[in-house]
Structures are given as structure tokens and as C-alpha cells.
């Protein structure tokens, strides 16, 4: 079930467009040191993933290209499927945590909520969620 939800999200990000006609782009996550991987970072990452899975449609836009993150040997698809299959998020194996840091450890810049639209700015990436 979780794998199916993520595949739907991946198709949204890479191949679809939302009801407002905005083409969905890919995301870019900047690698950060292991020491910054904290419980609040995990909570924020999981919250953003929860938004992806519960919204009607989503859009991610970044000023940098990230094609390799989706199709490389350490692709987003494979890593996130691994993460979503683990029950206890605070006891992830070290290797999985190391691989996930560039993908899930965010520095939240600002959040804007307007009716059914939530906009989150994370570094150079902007996330749009329509409910």
C-alpha cells in the first residue's frame, strides 16, 4: 500500500500536471552533515511526506536539476521505498539514514497557508499542496 502511494506521488512529480495547469517538476535536496539529522528533522520530513500522500495534487519546483536523483543508482524511488517499509522511523539502519539525508533532512524556511493551498519553502525548493 505504501509503495503504491509513493509510485502515485512519483508519477505526479515527474509526469503529470495539477488542476491549475502547472507542470510538476522534480525536487532537489542538498546533502547535509550527519550531525544535523535530528528528531525534528525526521518529524518535518515525515510531515512533508504525509502531505504528499494526503493532498489532491502536489507540485514541487526547484531551481536545480535533479534527474540523477530519480534515475541514478541511489534513486529517490528506491531509497524512499526502503524508508517507507520500515516501521520505527527512529531506529533506521545507519546505512539507510546516510542515504536518506540528502532526500529527507530539510531546513524549513517558511510556510504559507491560504484556504486549501499550502506552500512550503525548503531551501531552494518550493512545495505546493492542493487539498
Swiss-Prot record:
> What would be one Gene Ontology cellular-component term for the protein?
membrane
Name its species.
Answer: Saccharomyces cerevisiae (strain ATCC 204508 / S288c) (Baker's yeast)
Do the record's keywords include Methyltransferase? no
Spell out where the chain crosses the membrane: 33-53, 111-131
Q: Which residues form a coiled coil?
A: none
Q: Can you name this protein? A: Putative uncharacterized protein YDR053W
Q: How does it sit in the membrane?
A: Multi-pass membrane protein
Q: Which domain of life is it from?
A: Eukaryota
Add the further remark from the entry.
Partially overlaps DBF4.
Classify the main location.
Answer: membrane
Q: Which residues form the signal peptide?
A: 1-19
Q: Which UniProt keywords apply?
A: Membrane, Signal, Transmembrane, Transmembrane helix
Location within or outside the cell: Membrane
Amino acid at each position: 500500500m505504501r509503495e503504491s502511494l509513493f509510485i502515485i506521488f512519483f508519477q505526479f512529480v515527474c509526469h503529470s500536471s495539477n488542476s491549475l495547469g502547472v507542470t510538476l517538476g522534480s525536487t532537489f535536496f542538498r546533502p547535509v552533515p550527519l550531525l544535523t539529522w535530528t528528531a525534528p528533522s525526521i518529524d518535518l520530513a515525515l510531515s512533508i511526506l504525509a502531505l504528499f500522500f494526503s493532498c489532491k495534487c502536489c507540485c514541487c519546483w526547484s531551481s536545480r536539476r535533479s534527474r540523477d536523483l530519480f534515475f541514478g543508482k541511489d534513486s529517490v524511488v528506491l531509497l524512499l521505498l526502503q524508508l517507507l517499509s520500515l516501521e520505527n522511523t527512529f531506529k533506521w539502519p545507519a546505512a539507510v539514514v546516510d542515504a536518506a539525508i540528502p532526500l529527507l533532512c530539510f531546513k524549513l524556511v517558511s510556510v504559507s497557508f491560504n484556504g486549501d493551498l499550502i506552500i512550503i519553502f525548503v531551501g531552494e525548493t518550493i512545495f505546493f499542496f492542493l487539498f
